[in-house]
Amino acid sequence: IGGGKNSSGATNVNISGGEVNASTGYGNGGAGIGGGKESSGATNIEITGDALVSAGSSGSAAIGSGESSTGETTINIHDTNPEKGVKSAFAYGGAGIGSGRYAKGKTYVTISNASVSTLETPAASTNTSGAGIGTGYGSQSNADITITESTVKAVGGTGAAIGSGSEGDVFSPPTGDPNTFKTIIRITDSNVTASSGPSAAIGSGSYSTNATEIHINGGKIEASNYSGSAIGSGDSAKGKTGIYITGSNVTATADIGTGIGSGTSSSGETTIDISGGTVTAMGGGDGYDGSAGIGSGSHSTGYTHITLHDGVTVKATGGGDSSHGGGGGAGIGSGDRAKGNTDILIKGATKVTAKGGSTAAGIGSGNGSNGSTIINIEGGTITAEGGGKENGFCQASGAGIGSGGNALNKTTINIKGGEITATGGVSLDSRNHSDKWLSGAGIGSGSNVSGETEINISGDSTIKSASGGKYGGAGIGSGSYSGSTPDSKKGAVTINITDGTIEKATGGGEYVPSSKRWYSGAGIGAGLNAGTTTINIKDNAHIVSA
């Protein structure tokens, strides 16, 4: 239904009633409803009222523009009556609702007070490379997607469920410059369920070069994916990503990728700003690598900025179980072996609970992170636990707040307010036919860390409890075996306490019968077999118990 191949005139389709089933066959290249293949004219589609629509296509969009089209596309689905709207819209290569494969015209999709589903039957992901709602595979265009007061169920594959399509794969990566085009997604007061594969569920497709901006205000969001991010960028995406969530009820989970943030092996800069509402985010892992709950994916290289403020309640869990000897991602922070820098700001009346994946920090860096990490806590109630597992395969432990195990670059922790409870992780590494017990600090470094750590505690902060992992992590300071190299600068820890109250700082202490020794760390200072530690306590510092 709509325009023909190579058409240059505008195509206008208005559906306000009846039951419509429209699809095109393989190789046709035209939309099920909308523009024809290689058309240059504008495409305008309106679906409203008593319309019940199902559409499909191959190459083009199911509802939208044709393959390789260049005209602007505007789709408006609004004010549908109960049990009406879009029942299904699925395309191979093109978007379900949006633009066709290789399309170059700008795409506008508006869904308001409507019911929309891209698949008739539930599925976690598909094998399509176009977005469920957004742009098709290899699209070179800007896109604007607005969802208001609607119920939407969208499924993606290598293309996002809601956002941009894929632009390639490991064998044929995209050659375009990052951020040339931009996808903007606005979701307001809606009930949205989105799932995908290597792409983001809400955000960019795998190997996408598009810049992506995501605004979620109010409503309920359930997003899940495989190796991209549930909300953010896709696997190996290169574009810049901004994620802004306000007053929403959000659940974001991933099998290997990030809950909220950048996808695995992505390289674009990522900004995450979350205020108000309730957010649950879980990163994934496969035993080799884990990604952050909120932050960056494993092996990512882009800079990540995270701000949590204004009363948001957050529960974030990093991925990675170390079952194959790999590392984990932070609850909030970076993924396993991420190379990009990370800064984290928590302020206001926030409530944060964060747990690192095995070997990763609760709040801070993932295992083997090679980027610098800056953590600023200015308010809120914070509970953080470092990751670790006593399964014989876990190579390190993460700090509650600070660095993950094996971190290579500097970590700076500035605590100026809030109430903090932090616990270091505990691990057992038996991979080399001998047992090695490891622990991270409550606040400070993980185990086996060679990057420097600086801890600054001031202002009206209250450390309710800082507990090192039981095998020799410091309460505040270093994890076990951190900085235990001939180079005194590697893994060095500096602790500056100038104000605030430390109610309890406890080093880990455990007797291990098989090794016939105690594993102990300081309350404030060095962990077991750790390197250089400098402690400065002055001014109005108040230490109750250490």
Placement of each model-derived feature along the sequence:
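Surface-exposed loop/turn motifs in large extracellular/passenger domains
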Residues: I1-G25, I33-G56, I63-A91, I97-S129, ...
